[in-house]
Amino acid sequence: ENDVLKVGSEDFAYSEYTSEYRNTIDAYMRWGNLVASAGWTYAFSNKLFGKLSGFYTRYRSKIRYKEEDVSGKEGDSGYKYSLDETTNVTGITDFGVRTSFDYRPVAAHRIRFGGDYLIHYFQPEYNRMKALDNSLPDSMQIAKTFSDDKLWAHELAAYAEDDWSISDAFRLNVGLRFSLFNIDNRTYTGIEPRVSMRWLLSPDVSLKASYSRMNQYVHLISNSFMDLPTDSWMPVTNKLKPLVSDQISLGGYYNWNQLLDFSVEGYYKRMNNLLEYKDGYSLIPSSVSWENKMASGEGRAYGVEFMVRKQTGKTTGWVGYALAWADRQFDEINKGRRYPSRYDNRHKLNIVVMHKLSKKVELSAAWTYSSGNYTTLSLENYY
């Protein structure tokens, strides 16, 4: 699937010095995904099931910014023409295989294990720049291409977890995941423990708690405060380390008369080795290597979520509200001071309603409200 977005402007002016002046600005964006997968499931016995799958994904994004200035008419002695054009192309392609197994040795244990292997092909940035001005000599005209090396990476992971029903009231899930990422003669490894538990206080009331650690070797970098598909997938390198996050959560749940489910959950997430563009780099492509545009820092995300859900009767649905905070801290951004993340949406409200008219016909409606994304607007411009 491919999508295209084009925006632009054109200004005209007349003065005593020139018969015509025209300024034209065009911005062009194109992006798309291609996905293919195949899988095979097999029952080894009534206690062991396995699945093998292979997949291919490709993502590409292209941005072009073009500005033209024309003064006078071509052929006249006072004719002036200038052009500034920059084009950026970025993308990632993945090939992979994944195995997963589900083993139930006894009623109290459900063991899941498996692994996956991926080959990543990165094109971090391909920049083409052009600057023409008919008032300057040919030696000062610019038409250059800057391309970062295309990168190949290998990612390997293996995991195992046990869902253990210790009693009718208490359930424990314990898991461990090992990951390995190799790129440009550098290998990173990570251990990711995960544990969650559920305690049934009564038939209608339960508590849940969890902790998890995650290592991420491919960073999603946003270079715009707008919700545009201009984000880039960037790998870890010798300079840039993997993202490491730790998250804890605690929740309470109540079922009222088998009719309504009420829940409240709180969470706290800590992230290290986050990447953001340094101050001064934006949506418009530049000739600076992508690694040198990056700043590394830390972040936090925490909040509380409330939900009411109805799952019986002809009319069902749910209402959810989240009160959340998210911030970032980078030594090279905002003078090292902590600031709200782009995704620091303080309030979020979701309402979903479904109604069955008959066995074959169902109507549904959804409404979402969310606080806007944070951004910083410049106070001064220099030309």
Regions found by a protein language model. Name each.
Residues 90, 94-100, 147-151, 157, ...:
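Outer membrane beta-barrel strand-and-loop segments of large Gram-negative receptors
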Residues 32-38, 54, 93-99, 154-160, ...:
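Hydrophobic, lipid-facing positions within transmembrane beta-strands of outer-membrane proteins
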Residues 167, 268-270, 288-380:
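Gram-negative outer-membrane beta-barrel transporters
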Residues 11-14, 60, 128-129, 203-248, ...:
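Surface-exposed extracellular loop regions of Gram-negative outer-membrane beta-barrel proteins
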Residues 41-42, 93, 99-105, 163-164, ...:
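Residue-level signature of outer-membrane beta-barrel architecture
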